[in-house]
């Protein structure tokens, strides 16, 4: 009797890992004011994304929808494949917001203990105190903590549920330079273990240094989305820097291809579409020295892409 080779069993399909954030066609208005106008945003697990835009661009309104604090008029949003509120209830999402949410008359440790009681399972209190850099003030009343210390307490509270997604809205407000550095070192360490981070900030240097990806909003829409290098390349031109005592800014601004001139002490910076020609002029026609050519910085790109972002957008919500 002829034998038949066994047919190998077909392996069950592997379920695709849902993105941390999947927002499609988000629209939100407040009366006659259009705050968000058709935002599409997908954030993969493990990304660190800077969410930038001037006041009134729609960032905070978008973040509110990602957190389930408000509902879009149109469009859909999912967090790890669930509704935002379900994801938060399951401890998958935490947020560090700018203000509010702290009881002034209890200690830092008591605040964390109270917050931990809301979850079935949390990281140890001492662990999140250390991670947030506030172990030494654990017994201090919240009301006597500085603004930066209170912000780090909010960070510790957000870490309790060990969330897969951490949303930060101006997280380093009130922190000094050293506090900001320590905070971002902690964020980077957590992200290295796979946590997704989405943060809004007005400190463009933070976005430049710590983000894998930058999403830029203007007038309720996403106008740019990419790596820092990709975003910088969206604006043409270079910046020519030089030391030029007594520089005639009017004459420099009148040079062909020069868009603007900035001066700080003896240093000048010329934003130009023809950096070679400008550098040649400075070296041959002036007493300039220490001439260097650089790409546009993130601030220049930010201003170029957002422009005067204050018409027909949200006024009270940034």
Give the role of each language-model region:
Residues 14-15, 103, 116, 270, ...:
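A general boundary/transition motif marking the beginning of the first structured unit of a protein
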Residues 18-23, 28-199, 204-218, 224:
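ABC transporter nucleotide-binding domains
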Residues 213, 235-237:
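Short, flexible active-site loops
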